[in-house]
Amino acid sequence: METLAAIGRWLSKQHVVTWCVSRDDELWCANAFYVYDQDTVAFYLLSDEHTRHGQMTGERAKVAGTVNGQPKTVALIRGVQFKGEIRRLSGDEEARMRQRYVKRFPVARMLSAPVWEIRPDEIKFTDNTLGFGKKLHWRRDAGAEQA
């Protein structure tokens, strides 16, 4: 679980996720501020269901995406690529995650957009601070692995 812990520590320090969905052979990507939960290994975000990506997602969809910093040198590149599923939350689950989201991003109190969960099944973390091209891999069905 050391790999997942390293990935989680880095993701908890970031705040913007890019995710992409597909429907009827059409792809679309979006960006959002997120809260990362290390226990569920999931991103939580707010996004309007009437947007192009919201309509393409529906209640649940396959998703792929990235989180990356903006380093000034190649030696400092760090970033995550993932694939998994995105779903719209409801009820107590939505209320609980909205409260956590608003705590991190207080301006979100003004938004009525639904809360979504991105649950990665696979994560690849590139971390050049550990050596050029160093990759850490995690799969939900396999636990932690390193490559």
From Swiss-Prot:
Signal peptide interval: none
Record SUPFAM superfamilies: FMN-binding split barrel (SSF50475)
InterPro entries given in the database record: Split_barrel_FMN-bd (IPR012349), UPF0306 (IPR011194)
Similarity comment: Belongs to the UPF0306 family.
UniProt-recorded name of the protein: UPF0306 protein KPK_0562
Organism of derivation: Klebsiella pneumoniae (strain 342)
Taxonomic placement: Bacteria, Pseudomonadati, Pseudomonadota, Gammaproteobacteria, Enterobacterales
